[in-house]
Amino acid sequence: MRLALGLLLSVSFGFPTSFAQTGHSHHSHGAAACPAGIDARGDSSLQTVNLPPSQKCSTSSKSGFMLPDPNCTPGAVNPSLTLAILKDTNFTTRCVRDHATPPADKAKTYHWYQITKPTNNSGQTQTCELDHLISLELGGADTLDNIWPQCGPSHVALAKRFFKRKDTVENFLAKRVRDGKMTLADAQKGIATDWTQFLDEAEKECPGGKCAN
């Protein structure tokens, strides 16, 4: 499909404590309804790409960490996830996760990246995550231009695998936006461009992925 060129959100406000506590968590608040105004299929890509891609997708390496192919996974935001919605205590990732793209379709990205879909991929044996390049907590889209298989390394503890360390970056950026130290647009663009640029500071401020309020 042809994905339209999108624009980053450009508003700059803070998140409340409730959003900070959500972090990368996927928990829901009981049966509470999601905030009104969410278009779970919203997709504003950071650059125009053709999907499925006509060429093979390849990760690149930055200081030993993997980055996605921008020609396949440029990152995308969901314009309906405004700051007001992200601040709403009833908003959790369940409000948008798997609504635009079901898990079976997300798994196609393994083939795009020439990666064998892992088996027993849960708990301590998890080696890959179908990652939202711009996290849902930062207003990322649940669409294929924002999803890539982030894998490895398998020889280290689960907490040290790439996708877990990126989770820490996501929580750190959410806190920075909440504290008014970074705009949401800058956080989105930064994590889509090179999530590793924030890793050292994120792991200092949010050890184990847990950021102090």
What kind of feature is each model-predicted range?
Residues 4-14:
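Bacterial N-terminal signal peptides
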Residues 14-129, 137-213:
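Nuclease and nuclease-like effector domains acting on nucleic acids or nucleotide cofactors
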